[in-house]
């Protein structure tokens, strides 16, 4: 089988979903901006050679409906010969898009693909139109459809305290703010027009969601958001609602060498896994272990990790059971995570992979893992290797 490589990876700035910079920008525009941007940044790639676009999106309705992948590619003015499909594995949608496209390249069904994902949670809320079948209650706890309560359950099972959660959330904002100030996001963010608080058109260059003013005292004062009587999970220790998109240009190693392109990373292995929906946030643990086994690697072989921070109460048990608690500061989410940057559902998989690859380049890391939990009890993971 062919080796699959990433030659470029970018994202939009992350905008707040409530009255944020992208409140007048549609999801198709966020997506099209990155599709065009990838081709503009890589003039050696003939767009007519691109086989397919795989685009993650969870709420596929309203402006995100009717195959947003195809709508965005047409909006971007890409050749009409490029096919496009929209992928949904809930929170792992754009990482699943990466996996699907990679498999197509591995078996020779494509040479070049664009992958990515988008979610405009300000325009299409995550619970829009959700209608669970009542029969699910025979096999799954009702609370399994309430992500915050699953985080509460997982945190309690693993003895994660409110103080630990607040400290984790505080660190996420501090790391993300420091990364912004020091320019560590500059190589992955493709600036995009949005609107400031006065409604004026502005070029958005940085993430809007990060709250550098966050303090431990402020976090401690927040009330539990999901279990008012006995809970520990607050809005401050949960991933922020945000709007954004991310994208990658991937191809076979042979094609990259033929075109004289710099290979930024190679796919070593991929995995998905299921777990009890009541503790959906635990999914990264079995998925990561499975991906590492397929790559012939151990957890100690990995230099850097990007773990999507759905909730602090969810992230910390995963870090503990992967044996990474003692190296958390050195190896995990060096630039913060979704608690600070937000979690635009369909965007996040390729967003964390993009951030991981940029951090691997910056630090000289050889091996990295991007992994995330998925609503209703799944996990997904990808092992990357730099040349």
From Swiss-Prot:
CDD domains: thiolase
Keywords: Acyltransferase, Cytoplasm, Fatty acid metabolism, Lipid degradation, Lipid metabolism, Transferase
Name of the featured protein: 3-ketoacyl-CoA thiolase
Entry's Gene Ontology cellular component terms: cytoplasm
UniProt source species: Aliivibrio salmonicida (strain LFI1238)
Family statement: Belongs to the thiolase-like superfamily. Thiolase family.
GO BP: any one term: phenylacetate catabolic process
Enzyme Commission number(s) of this protein: 2.3.1.16
Active site positions, chain numbering: 91, 343, 373
Pathway annotation from the record: Lipid metabolism; fatty acid beta-oxidation
Broad class of enzyme this protein falls into: transferase
NCBIfam families on file: AcCoA-C-Actrans, fadA, PRK08947.1
Keyword Acyltransferase applies: yes
Catalytic reactions of this protein: an acyl-CoA + acetyl-CoA = a 3-oxoacyl-CoA + CoA
């Amino acid at each position: 089988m062919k080796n699959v490589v990433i030659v470029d990876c970018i994202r939009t700035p992350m905008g707040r979903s409530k009255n944020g910079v992208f409140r007048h920008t549609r999801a198709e525009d966020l997506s099209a901006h990155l599709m065009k941007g990838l081709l503009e940044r890589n003039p050696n790639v003939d767009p007519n050679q691109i086989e397919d676009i795989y685009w993650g999106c969870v709420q596929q309705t309203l402006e995100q409906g009717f195959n947003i992948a195809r709508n965005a590619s047409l909006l971007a003015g890409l050749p009409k010969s490029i096919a496009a499909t929209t992928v949904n594995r809930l929170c792992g949608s754009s990482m699943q898009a990466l996996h699907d496209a990679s498999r197509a390249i591995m078996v020779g069904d494509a040479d070049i693909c664009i992958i990515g994902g988008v979610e405009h949670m300000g325009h299409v809320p995550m619970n829009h139109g959700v209608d669970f079948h009542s029969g699910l209650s025979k096999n799954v706890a009702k609370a399994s459809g309430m992500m915050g309560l699953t985080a509460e359950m997982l945190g309690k099972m693993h003895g994660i305290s409110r103080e630990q959660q607040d400290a984790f959330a505080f660190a996420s904002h501090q790391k993300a703010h420091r990364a912004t100030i020091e320019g560590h996001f500059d190589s992955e963010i493709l600036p995009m027009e949005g609107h400031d608080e006065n409604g004026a058109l502005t070029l958005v260059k940085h993430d809007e969601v990060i709250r550098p003013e966050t303090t431990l005292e402020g976090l401690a004062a927040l009330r539990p958001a999901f279990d008012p009587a006995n809970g520990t999970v607050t809005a401050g220790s949960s991933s922020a609602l945000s709007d954004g998109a991310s994208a990658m240009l991937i191809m076979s190693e042979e094609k990259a060498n033929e075109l004289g392109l710099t290979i930024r990373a190679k796919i070593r292995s991929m995995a998905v896994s299921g777990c009890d929906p009541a503790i959906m946030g635990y999914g990264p643990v079995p998925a990561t272990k499975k991906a590492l086994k397929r790559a012939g690697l151990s957890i100690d072989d990995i230099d850097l990790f990007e773990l999507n921070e759905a909730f602090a109460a969810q992230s910390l048990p995963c870090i503990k059971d992967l044996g990474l608690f003692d190296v958390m500061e050195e190896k995990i989410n060096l630039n913060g995570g979704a608690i600070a940057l937000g979690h635009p559902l369909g965007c996040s998989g390729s967003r964390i992979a993009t951030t991981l690859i940029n951090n691997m380049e910056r630090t000289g890391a050889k091996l990295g893992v991007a992994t995330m939990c998925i609503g209703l009890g799944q996990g997904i993971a990808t092992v990357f290797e730099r040349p």
